[in-house]
Amino acid sequence: MEMKPKYDPREVEAGRYEEWVKNGYFKPSEDKSKETYTIVIPPPNVTGKLHLGHAWDTTLQDIITRMKRMQGYDTLYLPGMDHAGIATQAKVEAKLNEQGITRYDLGREKFLEQAWDWKEEYASFIRAQWAKLGLGLDYSRERFTLDEGLSKAVKKVFVDLYNKGIIYRGERIINWDPKARTALSDIEVIHEDVQGAFYHFKYPYADGEGFIEIATTRPETMLGDTAIVVNPNDERYKDVIGKTVILPIVGRELPILADEYVDIDFGSGAMKVTPAHDPNDFEIGQRHQLENIIVMDENGKMNDKAGKYEGMDRFDCRKQLVKDLKEQDLVIKIEDHFHSVGHSERSGAVVEPYLSTQWFVRMEDLAKRSLDNQKTDDRIDFYPQRFEHTFNQWMENIRDWTISRQLWWGHQIPAWYHKETGEIYVGEEAPTDIENWQQDEDVLDTWFSSALWPFSTLGWPDLESEDFKRYYPTNALVTGYDIIFFWVARMIFQGLEFTDRRPFNDVLLHGLVRAEDGRKMSKSLGNGVDPMDVIDEYGADSLRYFLATGSSPGHDLRYSTEKVESVWNFINKIWNGARFSLMNIGEDFKVEDIDLSGNLSLADKWILTRLNETIATVTDLSDKYEFGEVGRALYNFIWDDFCDWYIEMSKIPMNSNDEEQKQVTRSVLSYTLDNIMRMLHPFMPFVTEKIWQSLPHEGDTIVKASWPEVRESLIFEESKQTMQQLVEIIKSVRQSRVEVNTPLSKEIPILIQAKDKEIETTLSQNKDYLIKFCNPSTLNISTDVEIPEKAMTSVVIAGKVVLPLEGLIDMDKEISRLEKELAKLQSELDRVDKKLSNENFVSKAPEKVINEEKRKKQDYQEKYDGVKARIEQLKA
């Protein structure tokens, strides 16, 4: 198969994925004696196209499953997508708004048709992106969180938890999103520090004798106040407990009550109680049987309980209310106050604590079981392990989960209310006399169905499902650390509750993809990167390798075009190395021609030893998910050892007349390159398939080739040490040539003073390598080499490498040249020092610019020290 002179990812990747899918290479094995390995894809939302975070996520999953397939496992990498209730509904509503239509204009049924159309459109985009990334998914098993099978699972779980008393319906303070008009769970609320105000008001005593000072950050809620509370141990208020105050504006009389919840040292020590608009106030209200007065509607506008402010937006009401209180001389002071305010993770709206009747999951027992399970043999291993502590902490402090959402797109709650009696019926099927019942209009939190993903996608609740019996529990979950609470924790407690087993063995957590400057990627900053654009420019293999090897587990990844380009250069290096190897191997060379039992050269033994070391390292690190370290091991072996050294060394026998030695070299080239392709394949599936198909091979595809194994018979420690000595000598000679400004093309005398006779013999036996790579006019290897007075000497493991300088360079001229270079470097150092000592520059310049100047200083200093040392050496 022809390989073009330059690596072209478009040509390499064209049609390859379709061929893999068509031939069923990603389907599980038919050999049921094999051990299974399963990963279910974290389902991307059908809200839009995939971003770099998705690309990172799925690349890691694909690397793991491809590797496990090659290691002989029966692998299943199961695809699917999430309906993403609130996010998708918002997108569809925005699209309708462009046409001047609301969801209420359409009605529920027609709106859901629009949502399904949206889903189909974006699902096709997502599949196309999966294909471009090269993901080895079994599309015959693709699932969607609203498909029939998953809907059945959701209903069963809801009904079972309801019957156990774990799911309940109750009136509680919930997080209300007035923009999306739905309840939110605690972890869907993002807390942001904002500049606000602390308002101090007078609440006059009903008897006309003075006032009590009350402070609040949300004046609009005072319209729903039903009491004032003070700490019973607060001496300031002991005499007023039992008295009443008049609620400003409204005129309602409020009792002053004693409650130990109040912090004596905070504010005035007196606190207003608004049970319908604050979770702590609600608890106080329950203790004192206070009335719950809701003063806002679901849109965040003031309702009829707000009196003259009815119909006003809550924030407009705040301004007007403060203005009115000032006019009545009831404002004591207004202080600037920097505080944390909850915002909707989806809509960005300021979240309103709001009294509402919702459905909840009682979390105490579910959380305890998850925590207890981590102390058993069925525990889940977290990578990095520190995230287990994060998981445990959250589970230990968990609150009940609000699961109802005031949306249309999602799993409608399987609860019905009798039209006459109000009786509640919860069941997997609708009541038989459906005409007498009204189904709850709310849907379930998206994460409720996502929490069942590892087992619902495999056929549960059908316990006899072949997929469920064979592929559950799954082996690894790969996802971002930002959804440990949203998703990972919930899958764990639901998996334990409904299957009595952990849903996955390992959890591999990665960070966020950030812009090059470390900032979060976002539309508003305009610094987002479309992974498909990167693939169009550099190829899927370049992007995959960068994503997989660019950081360590649990850490964020800074996207860098320069680094992706450097991966492209690495692949191009591999490509060129493969082209050279294939040209020398020849088209007639077959797998059966590979013979490594012949007369292996030192270079052959060395590269085979390094190959086996790399196989062992890559396998071990991959099992620990240390793909960053894997990347370094592969890069060092392929770029340095194979391409830069072995390929060059192989030219010695290939350019000789020794046919037997040529055949041995062909075998080593073929064997080594084949193993390199198989090690690289999970990371770079496209280019490795292309090169592997050109190599002598067995089988139809590298996808199903076996993972490389260490062969003890091909490890030659002594040869490795000898080659290390030779390489060190060659590097020393080349560095010395640079330092005395003598090109490699010019022959020079080289002396090697061997440390002992054994080394002298070894180096003499392998002097062909030194001659090829050092280009000596004469080469003298001996233990008793006489070192000339004027010479450049380097100490190496094998002894000393000496370059006689007499006649090689004009000493005075070279010293003069170096002194001029030293002066230039001193000038640059002075310039950078002046800049970095300038307080004005340091205080105003961006951190990136300052760091760049520091880097320059370090570079100049290293060069300065090197040039100065060379001058001193020449003068000596």
Curated annotation (Swiss-Prot):
Residue numbers binding ATP: K523
PROSITE patterns (UniProt xref): AA_TRNA_LIGASE_I (PS00178)
GO CC term, one of those recorded: cytosol
Record field: transmembrane: none
EC number, UniProt record: 6.1.1.9
Record-linked Pfam families: Anticodon_1, tRNA-synt_1, Val_tRNA-synt_C
GO MF: aminoacyl-tRNA deacylase activity; ATP binding; valine-tRNA ligase activity
InterPro entries assigned to the protein according to its UniProt record, in alphabetical order: aa-tRNA-synth_I_CS, aa-tRNA-synth_Ia, Anticodon_Ia_Val, M/V/L/I-tRNA-synth_anticd-bd, Rossmann-like_a/b/a_fold, tRNA-bd_arm, tRNAsynth_Ia_anticodon-bd, Val-tRNA_synth_C_sf
Ranges in a coiled coil: 805-876
Chain location of the short sequence motif 'KMSKS' region per the record: 520-524
Catalytic activity: tRNA(Val) + L-valine + ATP = L-valyl-tRNA(Val) + AMP + diphosphate
GO biological process terms held by the UniProt record: valyl-tRNA aminoacylation
Top-level taxonomic group: Bacteria
Subcellular location: Cytoplasm
Motif, 'HIGH' region: chain positions: 44-54
This protein's UniProt keywords: Aminoacyl-tRNA synthetase, ATP-binding, Coiled coil, Cytoplasm, Ligase, Nucleotide-binding, Protein biosynthesis
Free-text function comment from the UniProt entry: Catalyzes the attachment of valine to tRNA(Val). As ValRS can inadvertently accommodate and process structurally similar amino acids such as threonine, to avoid such errors, it has a 'posttransfer' editing activity that hydrolyzes mischarged Thr-tRNA(Val) in a tRNA-dependent manner.
Family to which the UniProt record says this protein belongs: Belongs to the class-I aminoacyl-tRNA synthetase family. ValS type 1 subfamily.
Assembly description: Monomer.
The record's note on its domains: ValRS has two distinct active sites: one for aminoacylation and one for editing. The misactivated threonine is translocated from the active site to the editing site.
Protein name per its UniProtKB record: Valine--tRNA ligase
Biological source species: Staphylococcus aureus (strain Mu3 / ATCC 700698)
